[in-house]
């Protein structure tokens, strides 16, 4: 053992000194007691103030958390309401666009039908006018031809016979 601890062996061994004055135990107790007595108020007050500050900060944080939670809930409700309103507006817009499109198609079809009827009426009127014009021209041509041939065919006897038959036809009526 002396080989391991040469310093201990040179001092004469390992032991505890129980003499209070040599170990300064009384001085240490007095210094520690005085430090405890003086620092108790100072450190205690400092720690108490720190504890109160921490508690106040925690209470403020809890209040802010509750307020933030309430505001978040309100904001989520408002967001939900806004999304519902936006969806309603979108659906209304689609319905309105569909109604406008259908109305436009209906008006276009009606306008096309009216144009077709007008064109048909114009075509019918033009056909009737052309038919009437052709009749007049045919009648005028026949009259001109008859007038041109009439003097050669009618002599005075034929004229008298024609006049008599016309008068008898008029009397029957």
Curated annotation (Swiss-Prot):
It is found in: Cellular thylakoid membrane. Its main location: membrane. The chain crosses the membrane at residues 25-45. Keywords: ATP synthesis, CF(0), Hydrogen ion transport, Ion transport, Membrane, Thylakoid, Transmembrane, Transmembrane helix, Transport. InterPro entries: ATP_synth_b/b'su_bac/chlpt (IPR002146). It is a single-pass membrane protein. Belongs to the ATPase B chain family. PANTHER family: ATP SYNTHASE SUBUNIT B, CHLOROPLASTIC. F-type ATPases have 2 components, F(1) - the catalytic core - and F(0) - the membrane proton channel. F(1) has five subunits: alpha(3), beta(3), gamma(1), delta(1), epsilon(1). F(0) has four main subunits: a(1), b(1), b'(1) and c(10-14). The alpha and beta chains form an alternating ring which encloses part of the gamma chain. F(1) is attached to F(0) by a central stalk formed by the gamma and epsilon chains, while a peripheral stalk is formed by the delta, b and b' chains. F(1)F(0) ATP synthase produces ATP from ADP in the presence of a proton or sodium gradient. F-type ATPases consist of two structural domains, F(1) containing the extramembraneous catalytic core and F(0) containing the membrane proton channel, linked together by a central stalk and a peripheral stalk. During catalysis, ATP synthesis in the catalytic domain of F(1) is coupled via a rotary mechanism of the central stalk subunits to proton translocation. Component of the F(0) channel, it forms part of the peripheral stalk, linking F(1) to F(0). This is ATP synthase subunit b. The lineage of its organism: Bacteria, Bacillati, Cyanobacteriota, Cyanophyceae, Synechococcales. The gene is atpF.
